[in-house]
Amino acid sequence: MERKLKPIYVQQHLQAKGVRLFSPSDFQRVFGVSLRATQEFVKDHCDDLFLKVRNGLYALRIDQPRDEVIANRLYAPSYISFEYALSRYGIIPESVYTITSATTRITREFVVNNKSFTYSHIKKQAYRGYRTEKIGGMTVLMAE
């Protein structure tokens, strides 16, 4: 018989473990519950406890990850690049309202929590020139 997870326990445990963005398999690993129990719990608490980033990817509502962290997990493999990286490094003076990333997958655009994330296709040979950076306690891939 499986134990019943309580929302406050789940929230506190995820925060204590530093899990701000997770998939159902991540949730299973953290709490040791079945896939069905995971799916039911996440579905039941998606309005109050979790933010659905996309199918199979969720964030805590109370302790949301930074946009850069979401950008790296939303559509992998990818790294933050183009206009967003140029603005972040102070190379262009304009404010950038879209997180732009490079990916080897097809070009896509997502809107999560009223924030736009754009992924531009590049060839596999060109998928380099990035480094890891700590943002909000989490590792993010960012163009050099």
Question: Model segments located where?
Answer:
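Short beta-edge/loop segments at beta->alpha junctions of small alpha/beta modules
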Residues: 1-77
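Nucleic-acid-binding surface
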Residues: 61-144
